[in-house]
Amino acid sequence: MIRIDAVTKRYPDGTVAVDRLSLEIPDRAITVLVGPSGCGKTTTLRMINRMVEPTEGSILLDGQDIRQQPVNTLRRSMGYVIQNAGLFPHRTILDNIATVPRLLGRSRRQARERAAELMERVGLDTALAKRYPYQLSGGQQQRVGVARALAADPPVLLMDEPFSAVDPVVRKQLQDELLRIQEELGKTIVFVTHDIDEAIKLGTRVAVLRTGGRLAQYAPPAELLSAPADAFVEDFLGADRGIRRLSFFPSAGLELQTAPLVPADADAGTLAARATAAPYLLVTDPDGRPLGWSEPGRLTAGAVDRERLLDYGRPFVPGTDSLRAALDGAVLSPTGWAVAVDGEGRAVGVVSQQVIGEAIRAAHGRVAERAGEAAGR
């Protein structure tokens, strides 16, 4: 556990970057520091590995004050990932990742074997091993940065806005990859971001900081969304925090209806049989994966003009995705139906906005009931 105890960072000109901050950061979890510019997020992160020394207070790692350890020893127990990867431009990808193992005395062969293993773990093709950083995309460079930070198998990983410089699609991929890696490795991660959606998605606990480095609230994401501590936190979370909260309600209980499916290569008899089943038919490929919605009369036997199909929105996986994902799929679909798929992307049913709304009301009711029981104890 990392314990930050009444830590203040005051610079010689009188600027206070962090003001009496106290946090307990649990082991094997992702703790996110989030807040507006100037709230001391990065300063706090840098104090954990002594890139910046606190003016007052103390930081303990597993019960020991970090100032009692040599700086180099402390930093070798912590991986560090920054916004723009910070790769060595003159080294290959493999040797960038192998840097820390080599510094720790491993042979060149051992370090490179470890680097190759980590390339696979972070989703990088080992065919990229001999390339240089400038030959990689921004997302690939960030994966290299994560791999390098993990190379010495540190128990602690510090991440300073690592995904903010990439586009939204790549950012989501990197976030998902981090969650997968964390599930496998169980590191103690301190993650800095200014993006509240990223904080809610990744964080086991989220610390919201005010300008001037003061703690506004420290709580699990679901609690943060349901009970913001004050007007500042509520405003920072944004007007759509109710929608975000749906991310913590499972979709497993949704009652699916049989999807009115028709294969893209259906013959005239099949089309005729399905034509009266529903006002819209969900056209699928030969493997049962959805392609789009169509009115029955617009389909021609033996062939489907895919450009004329209506978008089916974003599918969701029951039991894996949340009610937010299901609602998103229904809202995006012109039919008002969300398409449910299995793990292979095959359509397994549909659910209406009305049914999703009923599930949301039931979920809120259960939360309120549990809150009432807790208050009565």
Task: Enumerate the language-model features and the residues they cover.
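Conserved ABC ATPase "signature" region
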Residues: 109-127
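Hydrophobic anchor residue at the start of the ABC signature
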Residues: 146
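The feature captures the beta-strand-to-loop junction immediately N-terminal to the Walker
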Residues: 34-36
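Short helical segment in ABC ATPase nucleotide-binding domains corresponding to the A-loop/adjacent helical element
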Residues: 94-102, 112, 116
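The conserved cystathionine-beta-synthase
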Residues: 259-279, 283-287, 303, 315-344, ...
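Helix-to-loop junction immediately C-terminal to a conserved catalytic motif
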Residues: 49
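ABC ATPase NBD coupling module
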Residues: 65-79, 103, 109
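Conserved signature/switch motifs of ABC ATPase nucleotide-binding domains
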Residues: 134, 152
